[in-house]
Amino acid sequence: RTPARGDADADLADTAIVRGLGLDLVFPVLHGPYGEDGTVQGLFELANLPYVGAGVLASAVGMDKAVMKVVFAARGLRVAPWMLVMRREWIADPADVVARVIDTLGLPVFVKPSNLGSSVGISKAKDVNGLREAIALAAEYDRKIVVEAAVPHAREIEVAVLGNDDVEASVAGEIIPSREFYDYEAKYIDAGSKLLIPAPLAPAAMDEVRQHAIDAFRAVDGAGLARVDFLLDGQSGEVFVNEVN
């Protein structure tokens, strides 16, 4: 990605600091806050350094699960039923928050900090006590908490996307987690999870998730490369876009 240059920053690339780096291109192999939320991408833009991957906008949207779901829905992509809880609401009246979640989504639900990666702070709540604990945990990490209805018998599907304006999608893969869901421990600690490539999907379902991956990538104004995650209802076959990474 080549940063857009205007008159105001025309000389930034000629500064001693940038010249001293001796870089032709930056490939940011970074994760989480500051690394993939648009912060370092903004730094590259200011320094007029070409870099690989999503720009400031796509990175910021891709980090904020709540904003991302709104964008997906606006583009006509199906997302699992969800609601946003603010930490101040939880602190002020936990009982009201719990009641609203159950009334709106029922149980079970997944509770997630809106702006973290690697499934940090994510819990599956199956009862009222579990819901309280899950919201309290997520509130330790973020002021914005996403609560999402659990997709029945969910299959975790992922598709790689490559390109800028002309975008290509890989075949879909399927994650078989070693735990109840693909949480932090399943991703990084135990080695029991499996990845099936290609995912065992019917041709029509494979085509659907690949097209939805391209649509989701374009919805957030993606660039370079990304992984788009889906949840597939094991009973109905419905496909829900989960997030772009």
Residue ranges and their predicted role:
Residues 16-20, 61-154, 211:
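Active-site nucleotide/adenylate-binding loops and adjacent lid/helix of ATP-dependent enzymes
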Residues 126-211, 237-240:
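Phosphate-binding site of ATP-dependent enzymes
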Residues 50-54, 79, 169:
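Short hydrophobic/aromatic-enriched beta-strand-loop microsegments
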Residues 32, 119, 175-179, 245:
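Glycine-rich phosphate/pyrophosphate-binding beta-alpha loops
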Residues 149, 159-161, 217-245:
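Conserved metal-phosphate-binding beta-hairpin within the catalytic cores
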Residues 1-57, 61-63, 67-70, 74, ...:
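ATP-binding N-terminal substructure of ATP-dependent carboxylate-amine bond-forming enzymes
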